Swiss-Prot record:
Species for this entry: Pseudomonas fluorescens
Protein name as annotated: Poly(3-hydroxyoctanoate) depolymerase
Function: Hydrolysis of poly(3-hydroxyoctanoic acid).
High-level lineage: Bacteria, Pseudomonadati, Pseudomonadota, Gammaproteobacteria, Pseudomonadales
Any GO MF annotation of the entry: poly(3-hydroxyoctanoate) depolymerase activity
Positions of disulphide bridges: none
EC class: hydrolase
Gene (UniProt): phaZ
Record bears the keyword Cytoplasm: no
């Protein structure tokens, strides 16, 4: 093969490879002196019934490209208190490390995971640890709503998704709600990642983890700041230790100087955890 032909072929392969890597639902803008950094991903929206209070909004997106034979694996991301996910646009000056939540959405979409972000009641907080409802969760509108979200995934409402490969993550109230998936939706999730949260019924320093957790509790990753003043690190550790004691797969990442926030390390660690549990 002539050298010129070989070089042209190599150049074409490099260009095509770069184009494939560049294809994304998301765009980024670097930080400047006058503007914060931004990551923004396109999204779709829909509404589903949540029982007595009517419908709630869900935003979602599927990856680019052709889905695998069984459909895209899917990650449910649960909002923290008072910070609704109205879109997938995030700036680096957001509180609680919100920018890194955006990087997580980007990372998941770019690596073949669909992302679904349901809304908490009135965009406020999840009912998983509200006194009264925490002990009778099946009476909550969250239970109705999230059951409808899971049914919609299975029916193809969000596109070609794989209901056998469902994952969940979230921060703060959304972290507690991630734990709720293990308690009230058994067998539905392959793995969980709890950011700055703990067991489903805990609330900040008010935290008692049951002596016996569900035997089919999904593998769970915890990401927590050691100096978190909202959800103390030790409250997460109670949950982590209980999983270890029962022989349930778990892992823990501690940000030594981290507070109540997403971390720069969060997107990569959550993706790796989900990848490890296909």
């Amino acid at each position: 093969m002539p050298l010129r032909t070989l070089l042209c072929g190599l150049l074409l392969a490099v260009c095509l490879g770069q184009h494939a890597l560049a294809a994304s639902r998301c765009s980024e803008r670097p930080r400047t002196l006058l503007r914060p950094a931004e990551v923004s991903c396109s999204y779709q929206s829909t509404w589903l019934d949540s029982g007595l209070v009517g419908q709630r909004k869900i935003i979602y997106q599927t990856p680019l490209g052709t889905p695998p034979a069984g459909g895209w694996p899917v990650v449910l991301i649960y909002q923290g208190s008072f910070f609704p996910l109205n879109d997938f646009s995030y700036h680096s000056n957001l509180p609680f490390g919100g920018y890194y939540e955006g990087k997580l959405v980007q990372n998941l979409l770019d690596h073949g995971y669909a992302v679904i972000a349901p809304s908490a009641p009135a965009d406020l907080f999840w009912q998983t640890n509200i006194p009264g409802l925490a002990q009778a969760y099946e009476l909550s509108t969250d239970y109705d709503f999230l059951g409808n979200v899971l049914a919609a995934i299975a029916s193809g409402h969000f596109g070609p998704l794989n209901a056998q490969r469902q994952y969940a993550t979230g921060i703060s109230s959304g972290g507690y709600n991630t734990s709720r998936m293990a308690v009230s939706f058994p067998g539905k999730f392959r793995a969980l990642a709890v950011q700055s949260g703990s067991y489903a019924t805990c609330s900040g320093p008010l935290c008692v983890v049951p002596d016996q957790l569900p035997a089919d509790h999904p593998p769970t990753l915890f990401l927590h700041g050691f100096v978190d003043a909202v959800v103390p690190w030790w409250s997460m550790d109670l949950y982590y230790d209980r999983l270890l004691h029962q022989g349930i797969e778990t892992a823990r990442y501690t940000e030594p100087l981290g507070g109540h926030e997403w971390f720069a390390a969060s997107p990569g660690k959550v993706l790796a955890w989900f990848n490890a549990h296909p």
